[in-house]
């Protein structure tokens, strides 16, 4: 429950000469804190206390409770828990009540995936072909086969990169069809044959759409920003004579052509969390058994009690539940895991006011920018923020703010709470002022040519 403040008669506080020294010291304190000059009688501000006739600063809880009361009639809609690195509780309101964490769930998925797979794990998309390769005509006489395993990074940039490598391998024409596996996902939306059709209209310039043209321009910009080699600003691509897309029934023998390895999964995770991409979270969740696999990880590894968590999705959509204290356990676990693996928390989550995405325009005040590393969560009547804030006096402070209410208002309240905690902790300590996120994940992808030589005379 919120701490209620008793309003006292101002005459007891500002009596006159006998308390002049006390008045002077508190006047200085009030001015430093931005309170009105108390030289004339006025009611105490919410949270102020009188002890032995001396006006004392309000506690952190008093200040936060006062701000919450400005937004809600009850504190039951607000779950807060802040804890220092040495485990000391700093601030709490309903820490053991269950709230919907929304997209903060993605951090649960993040850690479950990273524990099972190396941070350097890459998705692999394999290209092979049926028939033969006519070197003189730079032509595959047969079908191009594309097999993938639900890679969330495959997009236009990936296809342009693959097309460039096909050209380098001496392939400019395919006389057969495109055969695709069921695990092929493109641009996070289309799968199977639908994805194959978009591959066809991207690799073959004669079939380009306006979307293809725009994507090519963006690809060139991303390569330039990443200082990747640009051999030509003109797209050559691959001509498909037949141009049909079929589901691969794996009935025909095929020869290896090349492999496309995605960016390391750690890079994928940072993008997912920065932009809070639900489709990425669903696909990453497949790697660990979906919601039940992530929930099992939270109970088995993070040591949450079964009653502290309930998951229906790996993205945060739907009716998930966790306590603020349980969320801070997750953040502490993430911190310890990162230290053990020599990875920074900023490799997992965006930096407030620095990285693109959901935190790009938050915590941009000079005393907070670069000091908050966190994950946002938003649903129609849910707003959440959890992560770690770096402070000058207390070092890292783990926190969870899980709230029910209009997200726009709750976001403002969250920033006020973070500001109050930072001020109480000597101020925020910026750890990064420039983003290391690139324009495209393709800059960290790799292509390996593996062609088995079967040439026609």
Describe the function of each predicted region:
Residues 87, 101-119, 178, 272, ...:
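Active-site SXXK
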